[in-house]
Swiss-Prot record:
Belongs to the circoviridae capsid protein family. One of its GO terms (cellular component) is host cell. Residues 1-38 are annotated as: DNA-binding. It is found in: Host nucleus; Virion. Homomultimer. Assembles in the nucleus, presumably in an immature form, then migrates to the cytoplasm once assembled as mature virion. Interacts with Rep; this interaction relocates Rep into the nucleus. It comes from Goose circovirus (GoCV). Residues 5-38 are annotated as: Nuclear localization signals. GO terms for biological process: endocytosis involved in viral entry into host cell; viral capsid assembly; viral penetration into host nucleus; virion attachment to host cell. It comes from the Viruses. Residues 1-24 are annotated as: Disordered. This is Probable capsid protein. Self-assembles to form the virion icosahedral capsid with a T=1 symmetry. This very small capsid (17 - 22 nm in diameter) allows the virus to be very stable in the environment and resistant to some disinfectants, including detergents. Essential for the initial attachment to heparan sulfate moieties and chondroitin sulfate B of the host cell surface proteoglycans. After attachment, the virus is endocytosed and traffics to the nucleus. The capsid protein binds and transports the viral genome and Rep across the nuclear envelope. Keywords: Capsid protein, DNA-binding, Host nucleus, Host-virus interaction, T=1 icosahedral capsid protein, Viral attachment to host cell, Viral penetration into host cytoplasm, Viral penetration into host nucleus, Virion, Virus endocytosis by host, Virus entry into host cell.
Length: 250
């Protein structure tokens, strides 16, 4: 049997207490934990639905391509603008409250991630099967078509983030949106000329709750002899981060 040299116990060391053993003394009731972060952060998950209608009655012609973005649906009255913005993400299509205000008890926010799920809102057995494309564009310069100006080819065919999409089936895209920062000078462009790369984001003031975050484009080919409206439902899940709790009333 080997012999080991006895080691003296240090003056300040103690035996490790078993993890499953109860504490001998109660915790102090008046102990208040120190706030270690600069300001408290809250993560919120919100889901809203938008319906998009491709094509019209008798237009466009067969094999023409129509393209639109998530911001294609116009707002009705004073309700929030459908799309990727804080006001629509939190309140949906509800009208403003007292004093024509939308209130957030936080000073800052950022939209960390967005999940877009496309589903058919029509009977897939009664329509000719077709296909299209979805692509991610974070600067807002999304190619869209107007009535009578549809393309002969897919507008998003050359995009590196393009994925094939069939309106008869479920389709999902997940991306990190970027807020719109309009260019300076006398330009009339509304898309962003600068944004943080990768998964980084910027804190925005909650007062600017209608800033548009870009974005995703959708294209679809008209495959029937006579065009008819084709409605697609988009379920958008917003992952929002709020900072600096205030709790103040509007």
């Amino acid at each position: 049997m080997p012999l080991y040299r006895a080691r003296p116990r240090s003056l300040y060391s103690r035996r490790r207490r078993a993890t499953n053993r109860r504490r001998r003394y109660r915790r102090r009731r008046l102990h208040i934990g120190r706030i270690r972060s600069k300001y408290t952060i809250f993560n919120v998950k919100q889901t809203q639905n938008i319906s998009f209608t491709f094509f019209g009655t008798g237009s466009p012609d067969k094999n023409k391509w129509q393209a639109m973005s998530l911001e294609a649906v116009q707002s009705s009255g004073t309700s929030p603008k459908p799309g990727i913005n804080l006001r629509f993400a939190v309140f949906g299509d509800r009208l403003p409250g007292t004093g024509n205000q939308y209130h957030y008890p936080f000073d800052y926010y950022m939209i960390r991630m967005v999940k877009v799920e496309l589903r058919p809102a029509f009977n897939p057995f009664q329509r000719v099967r077709t296909q299209g494309s979805t692509y991610i564009d974070k600067e807002g310069n999304i190619t869209t078509t107007t009535s009578g100006g549809e393309w002969n080819v897919d507008p998003y065919a050359a995009m590196s983030s393009r994925k094939t999409w069939s309106p008869h089936r479920y389709h999902k895209r997940v991306f990190v949106p970027k807020p719109t920062i309009q260019q300076g000078g006398t330009g009339t462009n509304i898309w962003s000329t600068w944004y943080t790369p990768g998964g980084r984001q910027l804190w925005l003031n909650s007062i600017q709750d209608n800033v548009v975050f870009y974005g995703m484009g959708m294209s679809l080919r008209q495959a029937e002899d006579t065009a008819a409206p084709l409605t697609v439902e988009a379920t958008i899940t917003y992952y929002i981060r709020f900072g600096q709790w205030t709790g103040l009333s509007p």
